[in-house]
Amino acid sequence: VRNNVMPHLTISAIEARNVDVLIPAFEKVCREKLQPLDEKGVVNVNNAINIVSIGQLFPRVIYAAPVLNEYMMNLSISIYNEFTTIPETNISKFYQPYSWMPHITLGKCLDKEQMRQAFAVLQNLFMPIDGQIAKIGLSTVNPYREVLSVEL
């Protein structure tokens, strides 16, 4: 874990002059989309994730790839729709709905030999993983800092 950044799945990448302008939109998405109640008033979130493959973003990133499911796509759309209305913000073209590839970075800034070694290890050890998305967070990068998060 480099720079205290835990393994994570990035849903969106948003440039903003100040992270504080993003907090109300983040809270709204969390309140309206992440905690839906069923008819009995029970939280009903299908936050399953199935990590099925290993891949590479050339030239220096190796990642684990989850299957893009309805939950992740709906979350991506909700975040885009909510955050795109905030003045002086820009959402990366690589994280907009239908142009987003979910991935969990396992290593970055790898040279060719490190990449070969990583694939050799994972070829022997990787098995598909069924899990749950446990938390949604709003963070800054360079340096990394978690601003706000919601446990699911």
Question: Can you name each region flagged by the protein language model?
Answer:
Residues 1-152:
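Histidine-dependent nucleotide/RNA phosphoesterase domain, centered on the 2H-phosphoesterase fold
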